[in-house]
Amino acid sequence: MATRSLLAPPAVTSGRTGSPPTFSVIIAAYEVAPIVHAAVESALQQTLRPKEVIVCDDGSSDDLQAALEPFRDRVVLLRKEHGGEASAKNAAAAAASGDFVVILDADDVFFPERLEAIAEAVVARPDLDVITTDAYLEANGAIVRHCYDGRWRFEVDDQRTELLRRNFVFGLVAVRREVFLRHGGFDESILWTTDWECWIRLVLSGSKIGCIDAPLALYRLREDSLSARREEITRGKIMTLEKTRRDSRLSDEERAVVDASIAGYARELALLLARRSILTGGGDARRRAIAVATGPRFGWRARVEAALMALAPRRAAKRLRRREEDSWVGAGGIRVRRESSGDPDSSIADAHT
């Protein structure tokens, strides 16, 4: 395998030996029978085979067992009552036996050398508790961009502070199972951004995160996926940060960073809610638009858009409908044309700054 660059903070003494790790690939499954085949197949076709592949059925009504029939004895199928994605991942991690739990979403795929590359990184840097990789983002069957392409970068120098601003960790991670379980796994009370909250908790506890600077997975942007629900995701970010703010391990300076982040995501949410109100003809549409247009710290793009919504709501609604007809928004605020790739929605990013 070709040498790949590992992005990570400076090494520290961990007391661990750099021995080859074992991996348990876990997949949370809820109503994914038609699409889960490719994900499972990609986990089983790794050049470094995982110790096990665990699929946790989170109370699906579809025939997941039939979808997994081609894999039979090569996959462990867990069943539980519906409790959400975080609950399913926690159950799978608790049942796993590998040194690392490797998260794979049901609609994504690993490239064949991904686990091998992660294993090499673990041997080279036994102090790392979480390792991710770059990935290709796909929409409408075409590659949109790399995950880490300059617009979104992996933080090396000050992971603790930067995680309080944004989640820079691509979510298909390998995380030490013992560390993950010791710190409580994913918080099942948080929706949409539970992975970010978990990485914050681990880093505040001293964990370090590494990233292999090569696209070793395919992350599919889907209009109907959980990642497309922007208002709920933004609320989840605020909930994550509000929980983090109460953490006694934060310094006063770090708590100020959290406060600034909460304010930024609140501005982002305000713009999203103003848009929805304009689109639905809500009675509070003009008030919401004026609040964005005149509010402190909003960027100029958000102000201009909100001013148009306040002064010409019908025109603004027509423009928003046309944009929704032409494109949709996936993970990371990436706006994708319905038949081709597109650029991120800059006004949302502008609202947050």
Regions found by a protein language model. Name each.
Residues 4-15, 209, 221-353:
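C-terminal subregions of glycosyltransferases and related glycan-biosynthesis enzymes
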